[in-house]
Every structure is written in C-alpha cells, then in structure tokens.
Amino acid sequence: MNYTPNLLAQGLRTSRTYTIGLTVPGIDNPFFATLASTVIENLKLAGYHTLLADSLENQKDFESSLQMFRSRSVDGIIAVPVGNPSEITDAITGSIPTVLIDRYYENTNLPYICTDNYVGGYMATEYLIGRGYRNILSIQGVEDSTPSMERVRGFKDAIAAHSDKKIEYAIVGDAFSVENGYDQVKRIFSEGEAFDSVFAYSSTILLGAIRAFRELGIKVPEQVGIISFDNNGFLDFLDPAITRIEQPLSEIGRLASQALIDVIENKPQDIPPVQRLIAPTLIVRDS
C-alpha cells in the first residue's frame, strides 16, 4: 500500500513538527555541502525533514537563521555557528534543542560533534616535516573559528616538537575560500619568499593555491609540496592527486543527528550534553 504519514496529524498528537533547522556558512563550499548532505540523509532516515539556511559566514545572517527556525517551530537545530561566542551563545541556547557541528564554543554546555582539528593540524605538519620540508606556509581559514584556531595550535605544537630542525613558517589568510588561497600564494611567492611547502586549511583554499602556482610556473610537488584539509573526492582527480587530512563527515552527520533526536525524544535532561571530537585521517597521495 502507498501509505504517506500525515505529519500534521502526528504533530498535533505529539507537539512536534518533525522538522529540523540546519544552518551552514556557505552551501556553495563543497565541504559544507557534503556535511549538510550527510546530516539531511541521517535526519531523513529518522523520520525528520530538514529546513536548510545559509548564514554566508555572517553573524547577523546566522542569528536570522535561528529566528527563522523558531518562527517555523522546528523541533531542533543543527548549526555551524558563526560569530562572537559572547554575543550569540544566548541566541543558540534557547528552548529549542541544538547541536553544533564543525565549530564549537568552549566553556559552554552546548552539545557539539566536530573534527579534532588540533590532531589534524599536528598530523599535517608532522607529515610535511617527515618529508623533509623546512619552510612551511600555513594558509588558514576564518581566523576566529575553532577549526582554524585548533589547526594553528596543532601546527605550532608539531613545529615546536621538532625545534632541533629549525623549521621556518608563516601563518596567513582569513577565509575558507578559493580567493584566499590564490591571493596568498600569488602575493607571497611573487615576492620571492622561499617556502618549500604549503598547508591549506580547506580544499577551497587549496584550489586557489594550485591556480596561483600554475600561473607562476611553480610545479607541485617538484618545487613545492602541498597538504590540504578536507575529504572532497575531486582531490584525487587533480594532477597531482592531493595528500590530505580527511574529516569524518559521515560520522559527524550521523552522531549529530542522533544526539539531537535523543534530546527531542525525551532523553533524561540530567545527562551531560554530548561534546565529542573525532580524529581525522591522513590520506597520502602525490602532492
């Protein structure tokens, strides 16, 4: 039989809408598109629809997304937070259950499921050092976001652990964008800086860097090595295929969805909120 559940009738019985609000800071970014897709699929399997909003990496748009979700009476929210924690924590911690993904705020009770970016930053830097690179350009994303801050911390700690090797480095950049990667590489390498490797904090930054290197006539990996964060499949189809730190997006989507649904479906409130960091994986290719 072709049975279609009546969500309105179910909602009247349970005071639920079976709808979850999901906000990400750039659905045109392949990373956030993939992350959103995994969340939506897991919520669908659990019987929930998803209302998707794009904050465009802007705090006011993020706050507007939260307001819109409340006006639509969503049962819960999964959010990549954007903005100053002291200004938006109250906006997040309302009466609607909320789980953060990709980014989190320390010293709060907000649940989160995120990549362990410190481990990833350390791992990427250890790999470059192990390959013999001694002058590393680190191109970060949004400077005050936890992914960037934790990757920088891991990057610096890995270098400090090899102080005997006298590694030189610079940390530049301010966005998880193609333009950021392109502009930083074009400017720095045009000035004759002697970096022998690049750590790109996202696949979008990487693409910009690759474009700049080609315009400058600098060969990868013959003249400069590259490692990138993110697990977009197209990185294997670049020439050369890109060595990367792969994030566990499927697991993040599954665990975040389950954590939120557990709260919605009357999980005891005295249980501490789920706050979990998941280790990424080093995928070695040709770059």
What are these regions (language model features)?
Residues 166-167, 186-187, 191-287:
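Flexible loop/turn connectors
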Residues 7, 15-126, 130, 189-190, ...:
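Alpha-helical recognition/docking segments in bacterial nutrient-uptake
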Residues 1-18, 153, 285:
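N-terminal helix-turn-helix DNA-binding module of bacterial transcription factors
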Residues 22, 73-81, 137-140, 171-172, ...:
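Periplasmic-binding protein-like
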Residues 17, 36, 133, 152, ...:
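ATP/adenylate-binding site constellation spanning eukaryotic-like Ser/Thr protein kinases
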Residues 1, 46, 94-96, 162, ...:
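Helix C-cap/helix->beta junction micro-motif
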Residues 38-42, 91, 150-162, 187, ...:
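Alpha-helical structural signal in soluble globular domains
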Residues 24-34, 52-61, 103, 113-123, ...:
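Hinge/beta->alpha junction and helix N-cap segments in small-molecule ligand-binding domains
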